[in-house]
């Protein structure tokens, strides 16, 4: 009998943990969304994965990496543009490659 109560107590603690952390609420919302789908998806598991993935807040590190990527892309575009301008400027002062070889 004592073993039964200990297991019951552990289950209750685990249930409270899931409730506090929002797991039960999130699972319930996703399952309700699946239930309310007019056309059920072929893969209920894929539906759950997709909706659970969207329900979790994004890792802050991912957002920082996105910002860093955007900055680097801007710098890259600026450097490419500057490179074009410098090549055009340089072409004004250097004879074309074919003339150099003839000399």
UniProtKB/Swiss-Prot annotation:
- Give the molecular function GO annotations: transcription coactivator activity
Gene Ontology annotations for the cellular component aspect, listed alphabetically: mitochondrion; nucleoplasm; nucleus
Note the CDD domains from the entry. Answer: ZIP_MycBP-like
Gene3D superfamilies in UniProt:
6.10.250.1060
Keyword Cytoplasm assigned to the entry: answer is yes
What's the chief localization of this chain? cytoplasm
Q: Which GO terms describe its biological process?
A: regulation of DNA-templated transcription; spermatogenesis
From the Swiss-Prot or TrEMBL record, state where the protein is found: Cytoplasm; Nucleus
Which key words tag this protein in UniProt?
Cytoplasm, Nucleus, Transcription, Transcription regulation
The signal peptide, as residue positions, is: none
Is Transferase among this UniProt entry's keywords?
Answer: no
Oligomeric state and interaction partners are given as:
Binds via its C-terminal region to the N-terminal region of MYC. Associates with AKAP1/S-AKAP84. Interacts with MYCBPAP. Interacts with CFAP91.
The similarity comment for this entry is: Belongs to the AMY1 family.
**Its job:** May control the transcriptional activity of MYC. Stimulates the activation of E box-dependent transcription by MYC.
Q: What is this protein called?
A: c-Myc-binding protein
Taxonomic classification: Eukaryota, Metazoa, Chordata, Craniata, Vertebrata
Q: What's the name of its gene?
A: MYCBP
